[in-house]
Structures are given as C-alpha cells and as structure tokens.
Amino acid sequence: MQNYYDQFDACREHDIPMCADACPFKIDILDLQERITKKRFNAAYKSIRDKVAFPAIVCEICPAYCEKACIRQIIDTPLQIRRLEKSVIELASRKSPNRYNLPAKHKKIAVIGAGLSGMGFAFRMASKKYDVTIFEKADRIGGQLSELLPEEAYMAEFDLQFTYENYNLKLNSEINDISPLCITEDNADGFDVIYVATGKGGNSFNVPFPGADSEDTRGCMSI
C-alpha cells in the first residue's frame, strides 16, 4: 500500500474528482485516500460503508468505473482504487455496524427480490426502523450473487451488516401480482411502499419508470 501514498499526495482534484464523480455510490475518494494514508483503516472502512450497504460484496464485484475515470492514466496508470478498498476491508479491525436507538416507524415496506439491490434497500429501510418484509421466490437470498461469489462470502456480509436490524423474510414466495400488496379501500393492511428488485429477466409488473425503454438502460448485473 505504501506504493500508492505518493500518488495520493499528487492528486490535485480538490473539487469533485473525476473518479468520485464516476462512482455510482459517490464514495468520497479524497477522504478515503486521506484516511488510508494515515493508516486509519477503521475510519476508511466507515467511509466506504456510509455509501455502500455491503462493502465486502460490492468491492468484489465492482467494475471500478473510478479507475477508468482516473486522470492519473494520462501520466502512467490509474490509481488502483478498488484494490485499495479491498485492502481496507481486510485491514479494518472494527467492522461491526453502528447501533442506533431509533423509534420504530409504522410504515410497512415490501421488497420483492432478495438479490443485492433488494437486500441493500431492505437494509437501509430496516436501519431507519421501518417494518420491512422481503419476498423471495427462491429458497435462499442473494440472487445472481451466487454466480459471482461463494455463498458463504456474501451470506457472512449480509449477516454482519444486518446484525442490529430486523426484517421479515419470506422465501419460496413468488409474487406475480403486486395488487394484493397495495393499500386499497378493501385492503388496509397493505404495504405503504413496494420496492421491485426482481433482477435481470425478472417481473417488472409493468411498473413504468423514466428511461425504461432507453437503449442505454441495462440491468446492474449486465454492466
């Protein structure tokens, strides 16, 4: 890691650097670099986790858009940011999530699909103490992660980050129609929010969203 410290000092993009702008999660790369340079690996880990729900998973499958945007490549080679982030995860000694004593919220949230997107949204909502229920048609969570990582790796990360959060998980529960989940005059017990995360080739339930028919729209796993 010492090899990268000189590159940190040479970085002069003190506005929003191109690497951070290219990051889908908008990780503060300069802040991360500063913490790594000072060998504050626990603080660096927190910097990543503040933006990414499951750092150990995302750092393994990340396509590293930040490196493609790094202007260092004009001189020689881009900064190996993804490798540095993986090193932070390995070197951090305190990874336990923070525990917040927040009052429970009475809004109910349904998440359809227990892949990375669904689990990430469920985690963020559960951490805000919403009543979260995840519906997954398979007999396990993870979705397409099973094609990319060993099951024990991503399950360990899910377990770690959900340490202090509660959610309801319904496996073998395929949803073909979201109407029964919605609040109506005849169904006051429906969900206030429904998050559709059915993944590549999954059921969209004909829910429209801007840009869905664009040629530039791709599933996250196809990038």
List each language-model region with its residue ranges.
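Feature captures the FAD/FMN-dependent oxidoreductase FAD-binding
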Residues: 108-112, 159-204
